[in-house]
Amino acid sequence: MVFASNVTEEEIKKERSIARELRQSTWWKRKCADGTCYYCNSRVPAKLLTMDHIVPLVRGGKSVKSNIVTACKACNNKKKYLLPMEWEEYLLDLT
């Protein structure tokens, strides 16, 4: 999918690099230790949680703590590049 965005590949690479560094941090390890998916509230073993950007990098999101949450693989794969409002609409369509 293509977005009308001014986000360059270089910016995305930079943000992914920052995200890799955050994955090594005590902050991220504590978030994973909680074992909860931000989106579905499922309990998930820490090693199976993924890092998700609430506002995706391709949509202009940044790799900052306020934009990063733990997500189960199922939710992360379904959410992909959706913004929070779009994700909510997706969930409503399921019901």
Regions found by a protein language model. Name each.
Residues A46-K47, K78-Y81:
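Short, non-ligating residues that shape and space the ligands of small metal-coordination modules
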Residues G35, L49, T70:
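Cys/His-enriched microdomains
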Residues G60-K78:
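Short beta-strand-alpha-helix junction that forms the catalytic/metal-binding core
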Residues T50-P56:
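Histidine-centered catalytic micro-motifs used for acid/base chemistry in nuclease
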Residues M1-Y39:
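Short, charged surface segments at domain edges that flank catalytic/cofactor-binding sites
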